[in-house]
Amino acid sequence: MTPVEIRNMNNEELLKLLEEKKRTLMNLRFQNALGELRDPSLIQKTKKDIARIKTILRERELGIRR
């Protein structure tokens, strides 16, 4: 997801998306541990999405807008 797409969501949607991404990351890590994950780069992409969401939530909390 791009930061623009994330910024267009409200806080409730972002929190829901954050929980979904965390569950996805957990599942990807399990698949990787079992050797079933075909594309390990998905773990890194998911972690970056989580960081983007958290950053935007924190910006809103502090009243910062880029």
From Swiss-Prot:
Transmembrane segments annotated in the record for this chain: none
Swiss-Prot/TrEMBL keywords: Ribonucleoprotein, Ribosomal protein
GO biological process assignments: translation
A Pfam family of this chain: Ribosomal_L29
SUPFAM superfamilies: Ribosomal protein L29 (L29p)
Gene Ontology, cellular component aspect: cytosolic large ribosomal subunit
CDD domains per UniProt: Ribosomal_L29_HIP
Gene3D superfamilies: 1.10.287.310
Cited InterPro entries: Ribosomal_protein_uL29, Ribosomal_uL29, Ribosomal_uL29_sf
Annotated family: Belongs to the universal ribosomal protein uL29 family.
UniProt name for this protein: Large ribosomal subunit protein uL29
Originating species: Fervidobacterium nodosum (strain ATCC 35602 / DSM 5306 / Rt17-B1)
